[in-house]
From Swiss-Prot:
GO molecular function, one term: structural constituent of ribosome
Origin organism lineage: Bacteria, Bacillati, Actinomycetota, Actinomycetes, Mycobacteriales
Cellular component terms (Gene Ontology): cytosolic small ribosomal subunit
Gene Ontology biological process: translation
Protein name: Small ribosomal subunit protein uS15
InterPro entries: Ribosomal_uS15 (IPR000589), Ribosomal_uS15_bac-type (IPR005290), uS15_NS1_RNA-bd_sf (IPR009068)
Keyword Hydrolase annotated: no
Amino acid sequence: MALTAEQKKEILNSYGLHETDTGSPEAQIALLTKRISDLTEHLKVHKHDHHSRRGLLLLVGRRRRLIKYISQIDVQRYRSLIERLGLRR
């Protein structure tokens, strides 16, 4: 269920600004998106897992705040990130 180190490294290499980038909004949003999709799949099977559902809502809120931040900083970076991740806005 949790992301492995290899999965994190792969996501950070494709969405980070440089090789060791872990703190840029793009990298954080990409990692959160992967965690959200994994939790969504878990909740499809375990419908009554309300603790995980609350965690999912917290992750979605954190990602939404980061997306809002990047849209205010640079609209072009925001649009390319949304398109690459396949998110709707």
